[in-house]
């Protein structure tokens, strides 16, 4: 008599399902145990199904107060039918985070656009400006007449590099030293659709240099978008402190660089969440112009939980 293979297969399937369920429960318990000695999180009780996403978010470098507030919102608003499903919890949490991130789309109207890049030293302002210049002047969808002004008279090497970029791209470039000459430089480039302005890297504590930058803005005679350039590799406390130091310049958008040089991105999320300032671009490498992508909340949230890859950036 031949063995009943159908019955045996069914038993094997049943055992496999039980093992899968058991493994999932063990995973949930493990995620709960990892933080058992932590503070009581303001009496926020994290159910087992939420533990995995909580752990990932906390390890990402996100400020704990932000994480707790978002987790509380998730607990209060997630439908009861979804709370017992870790996959549904994760999906809802992702969606909530995406909706909390303001992103500024590229403006494609006919008005002239003037962008000034400001920020601390070493964040890649000059390279980012070169990427923007190539993007606007030689973009696939539309090409704009693009001009460059540099106010960075302190770093001779950076100025020479920018002049080389401008020469290669056949773009007009002017260097300005005195505040009084700034308005005239903008007028000289009045035929341009886009004017990009490079500035000296400034410490947020150097009030004298920052006030000089403010004078350039006030004597420009033009509407200038101030873009604060920051590195994704900085600690969240430093990012927020730098932002506060530059905030009197009335920052329009953020540009976040060096995505390829870090593994955690919760700090970037917390910066945008706390300041409620739109982010416009992410710089994801050194290549000009390819390694600059328009900011999208989906991309940043994926980086927060799953890390950064060049493939993700190219998919954008």
In which residue ranges do the predicted regions lie?
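Non-catalytic terminal/linker segments enriched in charged/polar, low-complexity residues
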Residues: 1-98
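Pre-Walker A adenine-sensing motif
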Residues: 96-109
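Short hydrophobic/aromatic beta-strand immediately N-terminal to the Walker A/P-loop
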Residues: 114-116
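Switch II (G3) loop of P-loop NTPases
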Residues: 118-123, 146-157, 164-182, 189-212, ...
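Hydrophobic positions on the alpha1 helix immediately C-terminal to the Walker A/P-loop
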Residues: 128, 132, 161
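Conserved C-terminal guanine-recognition region of P-loop GTPase G domains, centered on the G4
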Residues: 130, 165-167, 185-189, 206-276
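Post-Walker A helix-loop "phosphate-sensing" segment adjacent to the P-loop in P-loop NTPases
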Residues: 135-146, 171
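NTP-binding/hydrolysis catalytic cores, primarily Walker-type P-loop NTPases
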Residues: 268, 272-316
């Amino acid at each position: 008599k031949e063995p009943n293979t159908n019955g045996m297969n069914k038993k094997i399937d049943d055992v496999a399902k039980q093992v899968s369920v058991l493994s999932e429960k063990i995973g949930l318990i493990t995620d709960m145990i990892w933080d058992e000695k932590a503070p009581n999180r303001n009496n926020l009780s994290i159910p087992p199904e939420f533990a995995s996403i909580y752990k990932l978010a906390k390890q990402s470098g996100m400020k704990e107060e932000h994480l707790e507030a978002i987790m509380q919102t998730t607990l209060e608003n997630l439908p009861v039918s979804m709370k017992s499903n870790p996959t549904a919890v994760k999906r809802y949490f992702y969606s909530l985070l995406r909706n909390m991130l303001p992103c500024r789309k590229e403006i494609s109207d006919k008005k002239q656009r003037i962008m000034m890049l400001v920020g601390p030293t070493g964040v890649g302002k000059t390279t980012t400006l070169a990427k923007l210049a190539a993007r606007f002047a030689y973009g696939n969808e539309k090409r704009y007449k693009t001009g460059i002004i540099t106010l960075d008279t302190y770093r001779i090497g950076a100025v020479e590099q920018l002049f080389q970029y401008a020469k290669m791209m056949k773009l007009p470039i002017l260097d300005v030293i005195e505040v009084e000459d700034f308005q005239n430089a903008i007028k000289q480039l009045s035929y341009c659709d886009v004017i990009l302005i490079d500035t000296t890297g400034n410490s947020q504590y150097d009030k004298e240099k920052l006030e000089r930058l403010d004078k350039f803005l006030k004597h420009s005679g033009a509407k200038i978008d101030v873009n604060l350039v920051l590195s994704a590799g900085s600690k969240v406390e430093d990012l927020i402190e730098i932002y506060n130091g530059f905030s009197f310049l009335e920052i329009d958008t953020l540009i976040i660089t060096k995505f390829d040089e870090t593994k955690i991105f919760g700090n970037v999320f917390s910066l945008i969440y706390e300041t409620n300032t739109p982010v416009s671009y992410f710089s994801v490498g050194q290549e000009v112009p390819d390694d600059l992508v328009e900011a999208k909340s989906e991309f940043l949230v994926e980086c927060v939980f799953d890390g950064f890859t060049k493939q993700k950036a190219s998919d954008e």
